[in-house]
Design a protein with these regions (language model features):
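Outer-membrane beta-barrel "beta-signal"
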Residues: 203-214
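Short loop/turn motifs that connect adjacent beta-strands in outer-membrane beta-barrel proteins
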Residues: 25, 67-75, 114-121, 149-159, ...
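Solvent-exposed loop/turn segments connecting transmembrane beta-strands
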Residues: 53-54, 99-100, 129-140, 167-173, ...
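Residue-level signature of outer-membrane beta-barrel architecture
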Residues: 20-22, 65-67, 111-113, 147-149, ...
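C-terminal hydrophobic structural anchor segments
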Residues: 135-189
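Transmembrane beta-barrel strands of outer-membrane/channel proteins
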Residues: 28-34, 75-81, 123-129, 143-145, ...
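Membrane-embedded beta-strands of outer-membrane beta-barrel proteins
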Residues: 16, 61-63, 107-109, 123, ...
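Surface-exposed coil loops of outer-membrane beta-barrel proteins
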Residues: 1-58
């Protein structure tokens, strides 16, 4: 999303999405966006615009495999094609580069490492690369772990940590997240989170609290 401002609020782009389940394990997803996003309710903008000749197109394709054994896992990979390229400059603004075909690819993994009774440890990993841009994010790597009923006495209380590194053409940004999902009642959860972010501008911290009801 750092290189493609198509679904980042307040921007929105028209999309056609296909989700096809091949069998109990394999799934294919395909999304085709208008290549330029527009602001909602802004005069002169139309979020339902479809104009490939002037605004280009943006394609996302993903193939995933899920296993449902004791040590369950989810593995997915995909690629994007975009022929209207926006990039972030050092001031965080979006600038339009020369129109050209732009490719990127990624891989995502969720894997159960340990499961016994109600105790569970899961690994998360993701990687993406885009080598065809002059500005913006060229590589992204992330690793995380979730602990269910390991630190706390209930599986509904889960501790998670995640570290990711984004390599931009103008520098590197590393961030850490520590979060704790607390089951308050059967259908109500609280999830405090703490983020630590480091880049060439310095080190910054963010705290947040999420609430969910299902």
């Amino acid at each position: 999303s750092a290189n493609y401002p198509l679904g980042n609020y307040p921007l929105s782009a028209m999309c056609i999405h296909l989700d096809y389940k091949i069998n109990n394990h394999w799934q294919l997803q395909y999304s085709l966006y208008n290549g330029l996003a527009h602001k909602v309710f802004e005069k002169g903008n139309n979020v339902f615009s479809i104009c490939p000749s002037q605004e280009g197109i943006f394609n996302i394709s993903e193939l995933s495999y899920q296993q449902n054994r004791t040590y369950h896992g989810l593995y997915s990979g995909g690629f994007t094609i975009h022929n209207r390229l926006y990039s972030n400059n050092e001031n965080g603004e979006q600038t339009l580069e020369e129109k050209k075909i732009n490719f990127s690819g990624w891989f995502y993994l969720e894997q159960c490492l340990f499961k016994k009774n109600q105790k569970e440890i899961n690994l998360l990993a993701q990687y993406s690369a885009n080598l065809s841009i002059n500005m913006g994010c060229k590589r992204y790597t992330g690793f995380g772990v979730t602990l269910s009923n390991i630190v706390f006495s209930s599986k509904e209380n889960t501790l998670g940590t995640f570290i990711n590194c984004a390599r931009y053409t103008y520098g590197r940004e590393v961030s850490y997240e520590l979060t704790w999902k607390i089951c308050m009642k059967k259908n109500f959860n609280l999830q405090p989170a703490f983020h630590l972010i480091n880049n060439k501008e310095g080190t910054f911290s963010i705290g947040m609290l999420r609430a969910s009801y299902t």
